[in-house]
Amino acid sequence: MEEFKRYLELDRSQQHDFIYPLIFQESIYALAHDHGLNRSLLLENEGYDNKSSLLIVKRLITHLITQMYQQNRFIFSANDSNQNHFLGHNTNLYSQIILEGFAVVVEIPFSLRLISSLEGKEIVKSHNLRSIHSIFPFLEDKISHLNYVLDILIPHSIHLEILVQTLRYWVKDASSLHLLRFFLHEYRNWNSLITPNKSSFSFSKRNQRLFLFLYNFHVCEYESIFVFLRNQSSHLRSISSGTFLERIYFYRKIEHFVFVEVFTKDFQTVLWLFKDPFLHYVRYQGKSLLAAKGASLLMNKWKYYFVNFWQCYFSMWSQPRRIHINPLSNHSLDFLGYLSSMRLNPSMVRSQMLENSVLLGNAIKKFDTTVPITPLIGSLSKAKFCNVLGHPLSKPAWADLSDSDIIDRFGCIYRNLSHYHSGSLKKKSLYQIKYILRLSCARTLARKHKSTVRAFLKRLGVELLEEFFTEEEQVFYLTFPKASSPSRGLYRIYRKRVWYLDIICINDLANHS
């Protein structure tokens, strides 16, 4: 980061961010390359090294510098979709590499501005509390006394020019913004980068980082105004408190919410939430929840307020049917790969008064999280691990790998899913997922060696079982290797709800929405 400050020439006011020279630095593309290698949870990054090799990056930078000084640098070839006079051959590949590098470049001034704004302020930073699992203890603690929730799907049909214009207010480097606008319009398949979905906003995996940044930055702009308006109408505005959580830093508690509002403008957030005694808002990517304690009429006003606010002030076309009003008493929230609901836990208390005893019934609201097994099987079916009914299938594409690599891949996928769904109280459905992946692994091995599934399960039974052990099971067997009843111990483990603090993105298979 110190190396980049020399190019940015940032002053203390952080008003003039000159990021254009960074586009021609090879180290930027190395950072983007390392980020891409660590992105996938399903080990689908084969061939990434070939696409982003140092030789290609050097050739691209040299070509860019040469073409920048030519008069006809913005002339396109209408006859060849894979070539133009600016990028030459491999237009799509070069555009992809540049956009990945630009995603790193455009985040630097925001991160530097955030770091400089933290100097001298008593804000605790913790890398262990950046997990998106942190949102569920927040809901468990605050949502039990609320009545209704707005299930909001944020509009996804945004023109990329609007995203660039929003970024223009914070990045004063016109050259970089013109170059970004040029590549967005030059890229032949840019319409496919933003994929409309029936239930959520999604991106293609190519150039995902840049478009997520631009989209989330645009969303945070309207969220900051929404927070301001909410504070103006809050009855406890002077003592309202807030929690600001994003993918890098965690701030425990801030007395004045306007302070949080500044940070949401200064740095891009992926996960963001705030609270007051009557209103709670949570967002992750393209879906948000607004829970409140009030009548359905109030929630209906909030619903149409969001629609008009998006359309009139932020050019985001929306429809009322994308916002659903649901009572928390009998509705499950489908959020971040979990089904969350409020369950009544009845209890009886005997009260003794002199010679008379009275039985008092009491029902306590309890926050319950479960694994949605049907959508999860649907995700496995799309990934060709099973059919739509959940019957395991082989993976012919992996048959060329070694046996150990095949077993490791299947085991890694299950451990990631089990790790992500560790917060569920009822993990019985995970046994079904383990069964599907184990049998799919055995079918793949049998297909490779032209043998039967029964033979491989008999020969690799113990080894195959160990590969599908979760962390909790491994700890149990290491701690109690000679336990008289291991199944009883595992039952106690599976009845516990665990939230991990190292999960910074939703699992690809769990993101079934």
Swiss-Prot record:
Usually encoded in the trnK tRNA gene intron. Probably assists in splicing its own and other chloroplast group II introns. InterPro entries: Domain_X (IPR024937), Maturase_MatK (IPR002866), Maturase_MatK_N (IPR024942). It comes from Cyrilla racemiflora. GO terms for biological process: mRNA processing; RNA splicing; tRNA processing. This is Maturase K. One of its GO terms (cellular component) is chloroplast. Belongs to the intron maturase 2 family. MatK subfamily. One of its GO terms (molecular function) is RNA binding. It is found in: Plastid, Chloroplast.
